[in-house]
């Protein structure tokens, strides 16, 4: 299944706020009428909805998300929390959380077009996994800096998660540590996502 490129408002009306996909938020009461199902069908619908929220927020294909679930499942810690940490430490998401892009798709374009350096080296893979002490910067040219300056200047410092720091004058971000669960940028029940996939096997 390919990455979603359709109307973004359609998705947030159905799933709720997806800040990684769009800055827009659903209007109160704009959700579609809920169809009430009984028992197993309703439980399945809720699990599916949480899975879709995760997928569209981080801009993943179904195959990519499934791969992350498998990797998280091999860890000794909580599968759900490891899954969120893996997704949050992707380079495209780190750029978004630093305020260098307005959305994750926007951050992905910066990476794909080779505007971003990690520890002084160009990285053009959006899924690149960042780690503590990584330094993220733009290339030292006017075009690269211009692409992020408006976003980074208008970003809200209060929304910057505690595992990151940003220097808005030098267009530079630092990953201080692996994030805590409470700093995940999406309202999500990750256990339902893990449950969804465990029932597919």
From Swiss-Prot:
Its main location: plastid. Keywords: Chloroplast, Plastid, Ribonucleoprotein, Ribosomal protein, RNA-binding, rRNA-binding. GO terms for cellular component: chloroplast; small ribosomal subunit. Residues 15-43 are annotated as: Disordered. One of its GO terms (biological process) is ribosomal small subunit biogenesis. Pfam families: Ribosomal_S4, S4. SUPFAM superfamilies: Alpha-L RNA-binding motif. NCBIfam families: PRK05327.1, rpsD_bact. PANTHER family: 30S 40S RIBOSOMAL PROTEIN, SMALL RIBOSOMAL SUBUNIT PROTEIN US4M. Belongs to the universal ribosomal protein uS4 family. One of the primary rRNA binding proteins, it binds directly to 16S rRNA where it nucleates assembly of the body of the 30S subunit. This is Small ribosomal subunit protein uS4c. It comes from Sorghum bicolor (Sorghum).
């Amino acid at each position: 299944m390919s990455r979603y490129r359709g109307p973004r408002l359609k998705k947030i009306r159905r799933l709720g706020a997806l800040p990684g996909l769009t800055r827009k938020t659903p209007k109160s009461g704009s959700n579609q009428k809920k169809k009430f199902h009984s028992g197993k069908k309703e439980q399945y619908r809720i699990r599916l909805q949480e899975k879709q929220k995760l997928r569209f927020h981080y801009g993943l294909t179904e195959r990519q998300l499934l791969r992350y679930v498998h990797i998280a499942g091999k860890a000794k810690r909580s599968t759900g929390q490891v899954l969120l940490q893996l997704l949050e430490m992707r380079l495209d998401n780190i750029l978004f959380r630093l305020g260098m892009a307005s959305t994750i798709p926007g951050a992905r374009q910066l990476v794909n077009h080779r505007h971003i350096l990690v520890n002084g080296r160009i990285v053009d893979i959006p899924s690149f996994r960042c780690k503590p002490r990584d330094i993220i910067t733009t290339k030292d040219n006017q075009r690269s800096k211009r692409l992020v300056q408006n976003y980074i200047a208008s970003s809200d410092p209060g929304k910057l998660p505690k595992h990151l720091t940003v220097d808005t004058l030098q267009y530079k971000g630092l990953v201080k540590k692996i994030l805590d669960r409470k700093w995940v940028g999406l309202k999500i029940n990750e256990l339902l996502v893990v449950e969804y996939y465990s029932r597919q096997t």
